[in-house]
Amino acid sequence: MYFPVFTQIEGKRFLIMGGGKVAARKVHTLLQYGADIVVIAKKVCDEIKEVLPEKSIFEDFIKNAESDFLEKEIQKAVLVVAATSSREENHRVAELCHAYHILVNVADSEAESSFIFPSVVRKGNISIGINSGTGSPAVSKQIRCQIEKAVPDYYADIAIFMGELRQYVKANFEEEAMRRYILKTAAAKAFSKERVLTENEIKEIIRQGQND
């Protein structure tokens, strides 16, 4: 069973083993969150070459695999994805990662994976990760579609607004109870109105909190 964790990956080094369609999907996903990606593969597809700089791509997999190059690259990485077309190579990468306590996702073996890519719903800064727990991407996809319908776009605007309001409240109100009142009341009103609150509406919430 996997525990859902959101981690900061911006600027962190990811090693992708493989250069095909599966690897390209992983690269696309990770780039959205600012990861520093290196790809090692026998052949790298155009989708990857179009989005990564040449220095981040090593396209002579056979030569690299026969040297200690791969092992050194794994040790540099925070997370590794094994997405080659070879079961043997994916298994080898997984074993090296486990030996060095590096988290690895193995595209063709969830049993060898120490982390997985969830199905993700993203609305602005809001990210919702989904794992069905069944090993079935089709189930996760259906759940994702239902959540996408249930989460309107204005949620993203409210999330940004509440983040900014939280910083303002922390800087201007010392009493914890008052902070909680303002933020809880503002969030409830914003979602009920389905929009960001106006400055006057915030002032009214603060006034009510001070009078209670």
Predicted feature descriptions by range:
Residues M1-K43, E47-V51:
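Hydrophobic, well-ordered beta-alpha structural blocks that scaffold small-molecule cofactor pockets
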Residues G11, Q75-K76, K123:
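Alpha-helix C-terminal capping/helix-to-coil transition sites in glycosyltransferase folds
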Residues G20-V22, R87-E88, T134:
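Residue-level detector of alpha-helix initiation sites
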Residues F58-Q75:
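Glycine-rich, highly charged phosphate/nucleotide-binding loops
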Residues L79-S85, N90-F117:
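ADP-ribose/adenylate-binding Rossmann-like module
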Residues V106-Y155:
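E1/E1-like adenylate-forming module used to activate ubiquitin-like modifiers
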Residues T134-D212:
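An accessory alpha-helical subdomain
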